[in-house]
Regions:
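Non-catalytic C-terminal accessory region of glycerolipid acyltransferases
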Residues: 1-153
Length: 153
């Protein structure tokens, strides 16, 4: 099972948190991997958050507008983008030119776990934290020395 950050919470995290993995505590992918005995292949990218500058995720605005109910998103981002400038919401935009680098990690396996362990919150949290930790270390390596919009030195 390939795990790549990309939920609403991850996609629209603020620019200054672009080098942080934020899966929003969502553990469904871990539950599925444990239940099916499937490995998780972590994937991360550096540079995609330079194509659209998110100033704020807009969690409070999304709650106020109840976007989770009608848009299935918990965010209403405040962004700086071309051609609109400063915007609120999910308008189409022209991505800024940015070098994007993607890395795939080694599969993460838990052969000692049984399908029934997928319903144990402590097991889910431990496995989730392991995946997030691996992904964060991968992103740290990709981001080291990176200059926004210019890519690697």
């Amino acid at each position: 099972m390939l795990t790549y950050p990309g939920s609403d919470l991850e996609t629209f995290r603020p620019f200054w948190r672009r080098d942080r993995i934020d899966l929003g505590g969502r553990k469904g992918f871990v539950r599925l991997a444990i239940r099916e005995g499937a490995p998780i292949v972590p994937a991360v990218s550096a540079g995609t958050h330079e194509q659209l500058v998110v100033l704020a995720r807009g969690d409070g605005l999304a709650r106020l507008l109840r976007t989770e109910k009608w848009l299935r998103t918990r965010v209403m981002p405040i962004v700086l983008c071309v051609p609109w400038g400063l915007t609120i919401g999910l308008l189409p935009y022209l991505p800024l030119p940015a070098q994007t680098t993607i890395a795939f990690g080694e599969p993460i396996r838990w052969p000692q776990l049984r399908p029934a362990d997928a319903d144990d919150p402590a097991v889910l949290t431990r496995c989730y934290d392991e995946v997030v930790g691996v992904m964060q270390r991968m992103l740290d390596r990709l981001s080291a020395g990176r200059r926004p919009w210019l890519g690697q030195p």
